[in-house]
From Swiss-Prot:
Domain (GRAS): residue spans on this chain: 165-544
Source species taxonomy: Eukaryota, Viridiplantae, Streptophyta, Embryophyta, Tracheophyta
Further remark: Induction by oligosaccharide elicitor is independent of de novo protein synthesis.
Cellular component, GO, one term: nucleus
Protein name in UniProt: Chitin-inducible gibberellin-responsive protein 2
Bilayer-crossing regions: none
Cytoplasm found in the keyword field: no
Region of interest: VHIID: 251-316
UniProt xrefs under PANTHER family: OSJNBA0084A10.13 PROTEIN-RELATED (PTHR31636)
One example of a Gene Ontology biological process annotation: regulation of DNA-templated transcription
Biased composition annotated in UniProt, kind: Polar residues: 15-30, 63-74, 86-101
Length: 544
């Protein structure tokens, strides 16, 4: 079985499985940050699955199940995934109406006759006197007050579906309803939220059409955002983690279903092979080595080089949280790659560096003069905090540091999306558009009611979606940027583009022949884009 990659945060192209949709349990373990696969230190933290629980002091959402679909549950007392009652669900508010009129109390304490008469007079007479008093105090505005009160009462009596239609959203238009709900969350419009969440719950389903499946996780992200902010969000989203062997199985499941990882690996390896052609000593620095899968094909290619293979040294960087998916530390990666190199008769050395990418300094890398240096960032640099998160701006610092090492090539593979600094409504809409394409591409390959597919989407894609929607500041680990922004950063760091060769382009086109015709390959601005239909999803580029 082919080796497969892992992911820190679980970007769209990796997976975290689950054996049982009922296994969600809540935890307030303070060791887990908002980013579920990143620890604040290098201490090993076993990652957890995430379900949802509302911590809102104003209204806790209860889940109500109806038949025939897998659904998500955000109740406080139940697990967030319900399989025993497969269906769409709706929310009700335990606190009742989101709007309530304040009671006004007027106490008379001065012993006046009015105060005495309040006790002794006929109740009907008392009511009339109070109305007369109200008329004097409110004057002509009393009719306005009554009108407003009646309007609120009428609104509250509306069923959510009717209220949504009054907003001009066509019945069943999930995309528009999701965007409207996100806008209501941004505006803190609790009444609109309480109307739209139940209606959304009737439409979304983790076993439905692509947009319905995605919508289930988008709603969970909105609920998590409402529940709290920052690190406490993911305290409400923790669930048990499967054993590492199951984890790897699900990673392989998605790796084979979609070509995104293979595209990234093949394009980066092709650029590296071109850049180090004729070199006798090669040093590759991989800022997210994961399982080391990317380098197997490159070692095989270097072994076939005319005149014999070069000496290869790989520095593998990965923080300790990835050890769970591997079932051990970086030494497992080193042993595996050493075995492959031995079979290929390639002189090989592995240098493990168990540290967060944002903490890497030049002194950690052991660069030796005379080596041809290649630096690889595959679906990793968007995890590195930039200037919008911290004045340290490790994203640009790393690029400047790498440039100071004079590499032959830097390879960058990233998601083509703009969610880093966009305001929340735009970020939500971009996330919806991007992941719609991802879920559609999966839908063409795997049955909708396939349990492995449901688990894969739930425990991989869902946690990234929730992070994008629910978290802010340092807790929002998923910070994608479009290629234009990466190009500007690399240029400012002193890099120049190295267009990918026609051979790389042709090799990837051959790969895509095994997949749907809806996958599109395009080359522009010196970069190679892989997309679904008209939506670019992943972009690969090389720099020197």
């Amino acid at each position: 079985m082919a080796d497969t990659p892992t992911s820190r945060m679980i970007h769209p192209f990796s997976n975290i499985p689950s054996q049982n949709l009922k296994q969600f349990q809540y935890s307030d373990n303070p060791q887990h940050p908002c980013h579920p696969y990143r620890a604040p230190s290098d201490t090993h933290v076993v990652p957890h699955h995430y379900g949802l629980k509302s911590h809102s002091p104003d209204a806790g959402y209860e889940s109500q199940a109806t038949p025939n679909k897998y659904t998500l549950d955000s109740s406080e007392g139940a697990g967030c995934m319900r399989h025993d009652s497969p269906s769409s669900q709706s929310f009700t508010t335990r606190s009742g109406s989101p709007l309530s009129q304040e009671d006004s109390h007027s106490d008379s304490t001065d012993g006046s006759p009015v105060g005495a008469s309040c006790v002794t007079e006929d109740p009907n007479d008392l009511k009339q006197k109070l109305k007369d008093l109200e008329a004097v105090m409110l004057g002509p505005d009393s009719e306005i007050v009554n009108s407003l009160e009646n309007s609120v009462a009428n609104q509250l009596s509306l069923e959510p579906e009717k209220w949504v239609r009054m907003m001009g959203i066509p019945r069943g238009n999930l995309k528009e309803l999701l965007i409207a709900c996100a806008r209501a969350v941004e505006e803190k419009n609790s009444f609109a939220i309480d109307m739209m969440i139940p209606e959304l719950r009737k439409i979304v389903s983790v076993s439905g059409e692509p947009l319905e499946r995605l919508g289930a996780y988008m709603v969970e992200g909105l609920v998590a955002r409402l529940a709290s902010s920052g690190i406490s969000i993911y305290k409400a989203l923790k669930c048990k983690e499967p054993k590492s062997s199951d984890l790897l199985s699900y990673m392989h499941f998605l790796y084979e279903a979609c070509p995104y990882f293979k595209f990234g690996y093949m394009s980066a390896n092709g650029a590296i092979a071109e850049a180090v052609k004729g070199e006798d000593r090669i040093h590759i620095i991989d800022f997210h080595i994961s399982q080391g899968a990317q380098w197997i094909s490159l070692l095989q290619a270097l072994a076939a080089r005319p005149g014999g293979p070069p000496t290869v040294r790989i520095t593998g960087i990965d923080d300790s949280v990835s050890a769970y998916a591997r079932g051990g530390g970086l030494e497992l990666v080193g042993r595996r790659l050493s075995h492959i190199a031995s079979l290929c008769k390639v002189p090989f050395e592995f240098h493990p560096l168990a540290i967060s990418g944002s903490k890497v300094e030049a002194a950690h890398l052991g660069v030796i003069p005379g080596e041809a240096l290649a630096v690889n960032f595959t679906l990793e640099l968007h995890h590195i905090p930039d200037e919008s998160v911290s004045t340290a701006n490790h994203r640009d610092r790393l690029l400047r540091m790498v440039k100071s090492l004079s590499p032959k090539v830097l390879t960058l593979v990233e998601m083509e999306s703009n969610t880093n600094t966009a305001p929340f409504p735009q970020r939500f809409a971009e996330t919806l558009d991007y992941y719609t394409a991802i879920f559609e591409s999966i839908d063409l390959t795997l049955p909708r009611d396939d349990r492995e597919r449901i688990n894969m989407e739930q425990h991989c894609l869902a946690r990234e979606i929730v992070n994008l929607i629910a978290c802010e500041g340092e807790e929002r680990a998923e910070r994608y940027e479009p290629f234009g922004k990466w190009k500007a950063r690399l240029t400012m760091a002193g890099f120049r583009p190295s267009p990918l060769s026609s051979l790389v382009n042709a090799t990837i086109r051959t790969l895509l022949q095994s997949y749907s015709d809806n996958y599109k390959l395009a080359e522009r601005d010196g970069a190679l884009y892989l997309g679904w239909k008209s939506r670019p999803l992943v972009v690969s580029s090389a720099w020197h």
